[in-house]
From Swiss-Prot:
Belongs to the SH3BGR family. A motif (SH3-binding) lies at residues 67-73. It comes from Drosophila melanogaster. The lineage of its organism: Eukaryota, Metazoa, Ecdysozoa, Arthropoda, Hexapoda. Signal peptide: none annotated. This is SH3 domain-binding glutamic acid-rich protein homolog. Coiled coil: none annotated.
Amino acid sequence: MVLKVYVSGMSGNKEVKKRQQRVLMILDSKNIKYDTVDITEPGKESEKELMQNKSTSNGGTVSDPEPRHPLPPQLFNDDEYCGDYDAFDMANEIDTLEVFLKLAPADTTAVSTAQIELKQENGDAKKEEAETEAEDKKTEAGDGDVDVKEEAAEKAEV
């Protein structure tokens, strides 16, 4: 499955440009692979029509809350519609971006499982070290108590 982000390279709307940049920045920061489709390039009319026909959210902005056609950025997983900027931003905020983008669970959990196992192994090693140190201290403290008691007994005899 290929994540596609439909953008407009020639938009005069600053809010649309900022939204496009934010979507791409978030995807890059989360190492999510995607293809950018610039609907304003010559020969991309079919992609523009696909975006406009399959988008269920119009991506309204402050300056144009009810646009006639969906505004970029619009996100698709292959040809399956994921959502517009507002839905993307909300999914990012509540940490459900992978579900929103309809990414395969194996793609995102493989790394997470490996990291969790590594942390558990490291945690077990640290736990064993701490237990060993605690036993050593108990042994040392125990020997020290015997010496203190013997010294006290010797002083009492004198």
